[in-house]
Amino acid sequence: NDVVVSEDIAQKELLGAFNGRVYFTGSVGTEHFLWETDGSNEGTSTIFEFDEQLPAIESSNLLSTQNDYLVFSTISNGETEFWRTNGAAAGTFKLSASGSALSSLVSIFACNLENKVLLRCFDSNGEGQLWVIDGTVDGTEKLADVNVFYLNSFPQDQHVPYEEKVIDGVLYFG
């Protein structure tokens, strides 16, 4: 079956499935929301309204799903914000403050490691960083500076292989 979502919702960005529902960001007029759907118009509803000062969500991406929450990022005005939701308004909140170290990062890899999400990122200077998110604001922190390559530094026709694997609770990447 095709998923039916109201045509009144603009700028839809699919996040993914979680706990039997599909989550996405979308706008109605100048207001920006986190939505959930079961695939029908009747089963589609907002669960959270983003900050009213947010002019527009340029993009949003699912980073990871855990047992009881999902982590996603939004980009607005060139700043990245990391969010988590458990599917309820009260369980949806920003993991990073505007202007914080996280707001300049672009995630190139996310994976689950035990009950946490690991992010391999680079900042606007191409400097690599490894971050961990445990689903709380206090548990969102930088683990290390890491030498990851800056994807834009390679010619467009050159494929640069990289891979990440979690084996026995250890993250390997290169």
Map each language-model feature to its residues.
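Feature 14080 marks short, conserved micro-sites in well-ordered regions
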Residues: N1-G174
